[in-house]
A protein has these predicted regions:
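Beta-strand->loop->alpha-helix junctions that form or flank phosphate-binding loops
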Residues: 29-32, 50-53, 88-92, 133-136, ...
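N-terminal leader/targeting and accessory segments in enzymes
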Residues: 1-93, 215, 252-254, 283, ...
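Phosphate-binding loop of NTP-binding sites
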Residues: 20-26, 43-44, 57, 68-212, ...
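Nucleotide phosphate-binding/pyrophosphate-handling subdomain across enzymes
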Residues: 2-5, 13, 17-24, 171, ...
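Conserved hydrophobic helix-helix packing surfaces used for dimerization/oligomerization
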Residues: 4-6, 64, 104, 130, ...
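C-terminal helical cap/extension that packs against the catalytic core
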Residues: 380-437
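Structural beta-sheet core signal
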Residues: 6, 30, 132, 172, ...
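Short internal beta-strands
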Residues: 26-33, 208-212, 361-365, 385-395
Length: 463
């Protein structure tokens, strides 16, 4: 067994790979700026995690894996190269991990994490014992990765830094396509080109499963067909525009007592028309689409859709994806990772469905200057389903601080109850002072605003 050192081990991507290697019997060490919850979990699982970066941390490593956020001049990268230790980027290392398994890669602008988790959960329940890597912890199993004994490997395929082009899956899912990551893809056409290259990676016996009622995927479907790839389209019946010999669709959506949708699924993937009923507890029409993608995978693998439907009914979601953090003083507090206008609108719509008639207060922490400025107009219009909107200052993430404030987005909002409060601490105190019984607090952030949920929950209990 090898000793593998991870630079940036606390992130969702590298922490998942590290867990996979730990479960496979390898020795794992890693370093990061801070000790994240993912890193704490890895310590409990047997990894050695260092805070900060130093050349001595790579001592004895057989391989080094670096996050895409780690620069070339990182002291551990430099020390590894000087010692002739192989240094891999995440994408290249993942490709090697998947080489001997049937790879299922989930890509797209929105819904990757939940769809990946649904597929992994269903295959686990169907006794296929899959390996998987997810961008967040799956609630049903409490982990974001697992080294399974089966021959299937399910992975969330991140398009940032073109990471997904290092994978070699046999089944690809593309949930939707919208312009995102402008620091990596200046235009939608740049991003589409990367996704076309992703589709080109499919082998002769591979299949593209794609949401066919998403406008952004239309050129990708055209490209896949011209390249001779097998294509399966999935869609809601109300939006059905599939012109494909292979399809799966949801019909008769109805709200259920679990808080999600119940619906019937029709498909022609098994050689003739088939149908199955599904009852979801995760809310929103977007999760119906995610479930369709999971069922398409099940059919392609020749497994029981009836058993898969039962597994989907027990699927409880992933961390920070419409995650109920708690209730206090009659206030319901929910965390969500939404950081793109379309994701925000879908999450607010799901909240309206789950909590009809209740006042919804949305807290949004903009994620990166580039995304906030490129999608400025879209963000300003994304909050129509919220009764009150509170916007913090931008979370810069990997970007340098800029002469821009998200107060400008608030000024452009047509919303009557939108306000800018710069710091998370000030936002938490405002909410503790002003939230009322029956309010729903929805915290939308891909940064560190989940601390608002924890602080407000604790503060309300003391109020």
């Amino acid at each position: 067994m090898a000793k593998v050192h991870f630079i940036g081990i606390g992130g969702s991507g590298l922490s998942a790979i590290a867990r996979l290697l730990l479960e496979s019997g390898h020795t794992v060490t890693g370093s990061d700026r801070v000790l994240s919850p993912f890193a704490v979990d890895l310590q409990k699982a047997g990894a050695t995690v260092y805070i900060g970066h130093h050349p001595r941390y790579i001592t004895g490593a057989d391989w080094v894996v670096r996050s895409s956020a780690i620069p070339d001049d990182n002291p551990e990268v430099q020390a590894a190269l000087a010692a002739n230790i192989p240094v891999y980027k995440r994408a290249d290392f993942l490709g090697q991990l998947m080489a001997d398994k049937t790879g299922i890669a989930v890509a797209g602008t929105h819904g990757k994490t939940t769809t990946t988790a649904m597929i992994a959960w269903v295959l686990t329940e169907l006794k296929r014992n899959p390996s998987f890597i997810i961008g967040s912890g799956m609630k049903n199993l409490g982990v974001n990765a697992r080294a399974g004994k089966g021959n299937v490997f399910v992975i969330e395929a991140d398009e940032y830094d073109r990471m997904f082009l290092g994978l070699r899956p046999r089944i690809e899912i593309v949930t939707n396509l919208e312009h995102d990551h402008p620091d990596c893809y200046p235009t939608f056409e740049d991003m589409l080109t990367a996704f076309e290259s992703f589709v080109d990676l499919l082998p002769a016996d591979g299949t593209l499963i794609v949401c066919a009622d998403d406008k952004g995927t239309a050129p990708l479907i055209t490209h896949a067909r011209r390249a001779g790839k097998a294509v399966v389209g999935y869609a809601l019946q109300s939006d059905m525009t599939i012109n494909s010999p292979n399809w799966i669709q949801a019909r008769g959506l109805k709200l259920n007592t679990l808080g999600g949708f119940s619906f019937n699924v029709a498909s022609n993937l098994s050689g003739g028309l088939s149908s199955v009923s599904v009852d979801l507890q995760v809310p929103g029409e977007h999760n119906v689409r995610n479930a369709l993608a999971a069922l398409a995978v099940v059919e392609l693998l020749g497994l029981s859709t009836q058993k898969a439907a039962r597994a989907l009914a027990s699927f409880s979601g992933t961390g920070r994806r419409f995650e109920l953090r708690g209730e206090a003083k009659g206030v319901t507090i929910i965390d969500d990772y939404a950081h793109h206008p379309t994701e925000i609108m879908a999450t607010l719509a799901a909240a309206r469905t789950r909590y009809p008639g209740r006042r919804i207060c949305a807290v949004w922490q903009p994620h990166t200057y580039s995304r906030t400025q490129i999608l400025f107009a879209e963000f300003s219009r994304a909050f129509k389903d919220a009764d009150e909107v509170i916007v913090s200052e931008v979370y810069a993430s990997r970007e340098a601080k800029q002469d821009f404030t998200s107060a400008e987005v608030v000024s452009a909002m047509p919303h009557a109850s939108a306000r800018f409060i710069a710091t998370l601490q000030e936002i938490s105190q405002y909410l503790i002072d002003h939230l009322q019984p029956s309010d729903v607090l929805l915290v939308l952030s891909a940064g560190d605003a989940d601390q608002v949920s924890a602080d407000v929950l604790a503060g309300l209990k003391k109020r």
